[in-house]
Every structure is written in structure tokens, then in C-alpha cells.
């Protein structure tokens, strides 16, 4: 460490020790908590299946910042820069539309070999991979239905796509030695008030059971399902609601995905974690930032991001919660978006680990809510930034906004040529 950072580090450790926090133990734990970065920030959820295709499914990537990745080589290059600017363990989350093939591949025919380059790259960079079937931006999803479609042939197509995706996910886990979390999200819903809310959900229930019927090694693959309140063009009814997937995950013992933007604007997923964990074996979190709707803005170090991290740490959910990011902002430098959002998630986890939780819990159990509030607020002023800077320097990444210099240089030399 440099002298100034080392001095600040030593003083900060003393401050935290005075309130019973072991900084070294906190950093050891932080190094066991990977954050899964989402590949689709790098190209506005375009993928490689049809680069000229239109994004559908009730989601939008707004903006037209130059330099988005146009192929796998460019996307991996951009990711490598982002990864080099973020301390600690990371993973990469892929969608099925990021396959690589010299010839067109139907989505229900994808195979592990179409993702072999990603596995080779992940091994080189010591990353785990996660996966998602892509049930959007496709002719057979154009009318707004996939796994709950009333047409059995179309429904079967999407069932087969999800089944094939599970095999890809298991391949990732087997090759990389860490389980791949495969999340199923579908856009199915209606713009206006439906007459029959039940039948699509019955079809979805049956379809999901068929999707997960093949037994896969849990050391390689974990199933997750994700709800949503509404999407553009599906404002009145969403088949895969929170109640539907909470019941499904609890009854089938899959993981449940909670996306920060997939609920009513006054709801927060930090308040849902402790309840859900009583009924499901695992949670997948999609940390995002909804602005008035599921806008998928870049994650900030705000109250909700901190609350999400605190719930994980306070309840020792390290082995049951998988932390992923889900945002896509096309109005700013896409590499910077990755770095900002992922560093903020890491900062939130660090701050949660540096909290004197045992002391605060004892005050709560004694009913001393005055002291609980006072100390909870005072601990926010403890010098966690000095620990963060030391952690960054230990991991050979920039300690402050100097990481932006590397992004700007890359933008001038590489992105400007696209």
C-alpha cells in the first residue's frame, strides 16, 4: 500500500476494532461473495443471434452512446477491462442469445458447444458463469406469450429452449467447478384486462414442471424463477407474478429470483429476503435501480442497495443467496456502467460486513431502541472508505475514480473505432 492509504487503513482498523469489528475477517468473507456481472450491459441486450433484431419483451435499453460491442470478441474485450477495475471475486451472467455459431441455431437447438468459447474465456479469467434462457426478441414471442402460450406447438418450442438452456448451464458448472444459476424469466402478459387469468398460469405451471423434469447435478446447475409486476405492453396482467413464482419455488424447491425493479415502486426486495428464505432453499438477487418503473438504471450505493447487502450479511445467507446485477444503460459508456454498478455492490457488501451487527442485535433484544438507532447512525460515519481503498489496492485495482482514466483511454483507442 502507499503510505497515505496504509496509514488510513491502520487508523480505520483501530476504529472498527473499538466497536468489535474484525476488519481482516470482514475482508476474508468479502472474498467469498462473488457478484455476477450481466453481459447484456455491453451491447444493450442485442446478443449475437440477430444483431439487427429488435429488443422485445416489455423491456428497453434507452440511449445511443457510441461503442457498443458488436460481437463476442468485442464484448469479451470490454468485459476484460471492466473486470480489471473491480476488486474481488466476480462471475459472468450470460443469456442464450449470446451463443456463437457460424450458422443460425434455433433457440430450442442450442447446445453447450455454442458456448465453448465463453467457457474457455471464463477459465482464463477464473470466473464462474451463470445462464438464462432468452424468451424474448423472437418471432415466437411476438404476441407476448412463451411458456404460457395457448398454442401447444409454440409452448413446446419454449419448453425445449429452456430444457436446452439447463443443459448449457450444467455444462458451465461441470467445466468451471462452480454451479451455474440458470434463471427463467418470461415476458408473458397482457396489455389490457384479461378474462381468464387462471388458464395461462396453469399452462405455465405445467410447462415449468416439464422444463425442470430432467435431473441435473446440483453441484453444476441451480434452477431459479423470476417474477415481474408488469412490462411495456403487459401492463394489466403478468402470468409469472410474485405469488405464482413464490409458490412455485417453495413447492418445487427451486431458487427464487428477486429483481429490484420487478415490483411496485413502493416495494423493496430487501424486505422480502428474510421472508422468502423461510420457504425456498436459495435466492437469486437481480440488483438494479428502478426509476419510476423497471428502468434498469445503473446500481448506486443508495439505501436500497445497502439494505440488500445488509440483509445478506446480518442473517449469514452467504451460501444461500446468489448476487447478480441487472441493468442496461445505453446513454453512458457501457464499461463504466459495469464498473460503477459492480463496485457499488461490492462497497455495500463491505459496509455491511463492517457493521457491528452483534452489538446492535443485543440492543434490539434488550428493547433499547434508542441506543440501537443512535449507534446504527453513528456507525455510518466510521471510516469504511479507508478499508475499501486498501482492499482495492490489495487487489491491484484503482482505489478511487482514477479507474475512469483507463475507461477513457480504451474509449479513445478502441470504442471510437467501432
UniProtKB/Swiss-Prot annotation:
GO terms for biological process: L-lyxose metabolic process; rhamnose catabolic process. It catalyses: L-rhamnopyranose = L-rhamnulose. The keyword Cytoplasm applies. GO terms for molecular function: L-rhamnose isomerase activity; manganese ion binding. Its cofactor is Mn(2+). Keywords: Cytoplasm, Isomerase, Manganese, Metal-binding, Rhamnose metabolism. InterPro entries: L-rhamnose_isomerase, Rhamnose_isomerase, Xyl_isomerase-like_sf. The keyword Isomerase applies. Mn(2+) binds at residues 262, 294, 296. Gene3D superfamilies: Divalent-metal-dependent TIM barrel enzymes. It holds the Pfam family RhaA. Its EC number is 5.3.1.14. Binds 1 Mn(2+) ion per subunit. Belongs to the rhamnose isomerase family. Catalyzes the interconversion of L-rhamnose and L-rhamnulose. Homotetramer. This is L-rhamnose isomerase. The gene is rhaA.
